[in-house]
């Protein structure tokens, strides 16, 4: 394992912050889509609640594991695997033809998000110092608020 820290630079910081938006937008965007999901999949109120909740549960359950995997196998690798898993799970959500398939895909999305998020914050903490670190963490927090709002649009 290579433990040397290389500053991500401006492009890297933008990539990390963009990656931060994916899981956070997905936290709130599903609420907007619930009406559109109800009729084609004949989803009950309980199933609609599960569509929202399973993502958060999978994210919370896998978050510490995602952080440890990033420490052991490399943050860049885990970030890329997380984005890939998240993207594939998003595609599966889009083509789901049953409520069970959608629930499974939402769970996978949460697991993918749990691989993405810890790599971002760890990379920022390890690679940046002083004012650059403070600015990056401020942007990280600001992106969280913006992403949640964007998801509701």
Model-derived segments and their meaning:
Residues 2-153:
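Transmembrane-helix bundle of Major Facilitator Superfamily
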């Amino acid at each position: 394992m290579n433990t040397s820290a290389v500053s991500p630079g401006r492009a890297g910081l933008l990539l990390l912050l963009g990656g931060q938006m994916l899981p956070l937008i997905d936290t709130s965007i599903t609420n907007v889509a619930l009406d559109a999901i109800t009729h084609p999949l004949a989803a009950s109120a309980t199933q609609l609640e599960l569509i929202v909740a399973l993502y958060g549960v999978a994210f919370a359950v896998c978050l510490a594991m995602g952080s440890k995997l990033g420490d052991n196998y490399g943050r860049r690798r885990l970030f890329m695997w997380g984005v890939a898993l998240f993207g594939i799970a998003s595609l599966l959500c889009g083509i789901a033809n049953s409520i069970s398939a959608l629930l499974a895909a939402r769970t996978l999305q949460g697991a993918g998000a749990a691989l993405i998020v810890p790599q971002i914050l760890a990379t920022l903490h390890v690679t940046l110092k002083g004012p650059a670190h403070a600015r990056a963490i401020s942007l990280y927090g600001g992106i969280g608020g913006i992403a949640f709002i964007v998801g509701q649009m």
